[in-house]
Amino acid sequence: MQKHTLRRLPLLIAAAFASEWIYAADAAQNAEQVQLEEVVVTGERTNRSGFETATSNRVFSTPNIDRSGHNLSATDLLKQTVNTVDLGSGNDLPTVRGVDGSGPAVGAVAFFAGTRPRLNLSIDGRSATYNEYAFGTQSLWDMQQVEVLRGPQSHVRGQNAVAGAVVMRSKDPTDEWEGALRLGLGNQKTRNVAGVVSGPIVKNNLAFRLSAERQQRESYEPFVSYEPTGNPRRVENTNVRFKLLLTPENHPDFYSRLTLNHIRSRAPQNEIMGNTASRRFLKEKPVFVTGSTSGIWDVSWQLNDYLKLENKLVYGRYHNERLHLPMTVSPQGVPAELKGRELQWEPVLHFSNKGRLKGFAGLHYFRSKQDEWVDIRSVGGRNTFDDRNSVRALFAETTYSPSEKWDITAAARLEKETHKRSGGSGALHLDLDKGQTVFLPKIDIAFKPTDQWVSGIKAARGYNPGGAGITFGRPVVTYTYEPEYVNNYEWYTRWRSADRRLQLSGNLFLNHYRDMQLPFYLGTNSVVIRNAKKVHTYGAELAADWQATDSLKLTTGLGLLNTKIKSYPDSGIEGNKLGRAPKYTANIGVKYLNDKGWEAGGDVRFYGGYYSAADNAESGKISAYNQVNLYTAYNFKQGRVSLYADNVFNRRQPIFISSADRQDALYQRPRSVGVSAEWKF
């Protein structure tokens, strides 16, 4: 019965869209006080309403980031976003429209080849490294807004954004005193303590904000304790953020903001128990300890009515350790360490003639250096690497409005990247010194016949740079791979009722990838990265938001997807689908809040079947699955108390299988229940 329901799901949601269109006829005559929230998308370097943003987007803003009290990380929001498959903490970043956000390399392959993620995650303008994203927790505490942008963002962000971007923005200091304290408690030894205080240092001139959070829980898998990791089941995260905001009273067109952020996380490499009877897995689970400290300095100055100058300076240091058995204890032990630092500078000039022309132009400079070592017996013992990356780019965007009904936007980015990676062991040595210059254009034509309807087409080019690596299984060889490119084409439409209580949105997309970086197996445990000549993906994202009454809000989303590796000679996977690329994903959400402060809500998420990897092995095939999450809460003047239950029916289906052994499966996280209390002052 469940399988039949899942198969009919796209038809059911399509019917829901049709019924909501019918609603529009009477909308203007039934305007109510409560309207849908108007969101502003900032992740594409300009402030643009979500309604007018061509990019397929899902925006979570305060106070709706965490209604349940249990949305603690960005991964919890990505799981609510259609056409994404998020597995949680571990090697594999989310897939977006079937494209693996991790990039072509994860795990040991990434340690030798370096990391080239395809999904960019930024917090207050600083992009997280692969290890921070994969094994850390991107805390939602004290966040103002989180934007999920699907599709290539290379023209905006350059490298590492060919699949999309997750843009997180924390709250700014306030000129009035405010604060909050949150305590959370749940099963699986879940604990959460968070606090924030904000207020003026010099009234109307200088304000500060200090926030901190500590999260911890215990993995549901029965990993055994050992040295040097201790208990691998411990999942912990500490996040401290301090902000200073200068807004001179005598210069209202100027502000300067300093953000200091420190994160430290600890988590098992993944929550897969694995078949410890096989030679592939040890019973001792590796643990990643990830830390970073960064400073971000933003300056904005409205020069006159037509020009505004913004400048961003970012400096960060990060440190990642893979704790595991040393080789002297076990030949299968693979401890590793990575230390790095980065610098980013980005000035941007915004212009507008207060009429038909507006846009921006800027420079981007990025430089990083990291030192790595990894012990692995099959590749000569200790391997050390020196990795240096520099990026210089010019970018610009202009929107011309020939009339009130038309907007024509042209954007481009010219980027030069240089990547040096050297190292290895005595047996094999890697020496990469390569640069490339790419031109990344975008064109967007929007038609706005009324204030209630926007429709348009857009085309953009994306890319991700190449690299080099060493295999860690026989045959052991060095290799290089080239950059990958994508031509993205989309048609989009947005419609809302006159009373702003119903909004429909849709994006149809077609992606032509050239030289997509995919694994190529030389042997059972020997994998290199090569470039597939052609990969095509196409599909759609549809969404509806309806404020049915002043107290009741309904949301629904549907993602449709088809992927195919069109040309990859001699790989054995030509003609296959990409991994973690279900034909459909969907969600239905509800929130009820009455004027007495009582609240209840939840969502149901559906995933069609998919293959775990591009080899499309039957042993890695995942069946369709779903999950139900519920919460209830009471809101009062100075706070809120909520009860939550995620995975209410305790579904425990496999969602990812990392090898040919079905015992090596990642399962849905067991039912989690708990309580969260927040006090504001």
Outline where the language-model segments fall:
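Gram-negative outer-membrane beta-barrel transporters
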Residues: E404, I408, K416, L510-H512, ...
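N-terminal Sec signal peptide and the immediately downstream disordered periplasmic leader
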Residues: M1-V85, F111, S198, D253-S256, ...
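Face-selective signature of the C-terminal outer-membrane beta-barrel domain
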Residues: D253-N261, T290-H324, Q332-G435, P441, ...
